[in-house]
């Protein structure tokens, strides 16, 4: 279980100018041909109580940035919402949280929550990989470009979240 993996940051004391990498899940429900994460066929989650406890440690230490390295952070909506709510409710006005997401999976409830956060609290790295429908099909990527565009525009409309979109050069 992911909860058995020890929290390695508790022995550190100096977090100034550090970026912390953190994982609340492993695996990915998708089967994209280019990605090693598709080998791990199931999405496994660290318990929310443990995640909140560990996030509070980062917040208390005023870590400048916590970068979630979950492959698709918002693949499990309840998990993502609970973490985003916790971050908003416990904002220390210093720490920034970075998430790798699939924008076409964002729900209206998630967009409303994200748009209500303080400017700079969250940044989103959005996996697009390609906008060519033939390429998307060839790489076995599950994505709705219209939903993605709409979600990116809705998040962008609040002006509080930095977003960047990932594209992979050299795909078929």
List the predicted regions and their residue ranges:
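Radical SAM [4Fe-4S] cluster-binding motif and immediate context
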Residues: 5-157, 169
């Amino acid at each position: 279980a992911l909860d058995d993996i020890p929290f390695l940051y508790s022995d550190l004391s100096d977090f100034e100018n550090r970026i912390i990498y953190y994982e609340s899940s492993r695996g990915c429900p998708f089967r994209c041909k280019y990605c090693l994460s598709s080998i791990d066929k199931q999405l496994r989650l660290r318990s929310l109580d443990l995640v909140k406890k560990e996030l509070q440690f980062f917040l208390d230490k005023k870590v400048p940035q916590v970068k979630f390295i979950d492959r698709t952070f918002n693949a499990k909506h309840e998990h993502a919402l609970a973490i985003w709510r916790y971050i908003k409710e416990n904002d220390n006005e210093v720490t920034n949280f970075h998430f790798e997401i699939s924008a076409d999976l964002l729900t209206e409830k998630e967009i409303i929550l994200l748009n209500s956060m303080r400017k700079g609290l969250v940044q989103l790295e959005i996996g697009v990989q390609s906008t060519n429908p033939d390429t998307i099909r060839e790489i076995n990527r599950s994505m709705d470009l219209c939903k993605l565009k709409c979600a990116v525009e809705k998040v962008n409309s609040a002006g509080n979240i930095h977003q960047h979109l990932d594209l992979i050069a050299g795909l078929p």
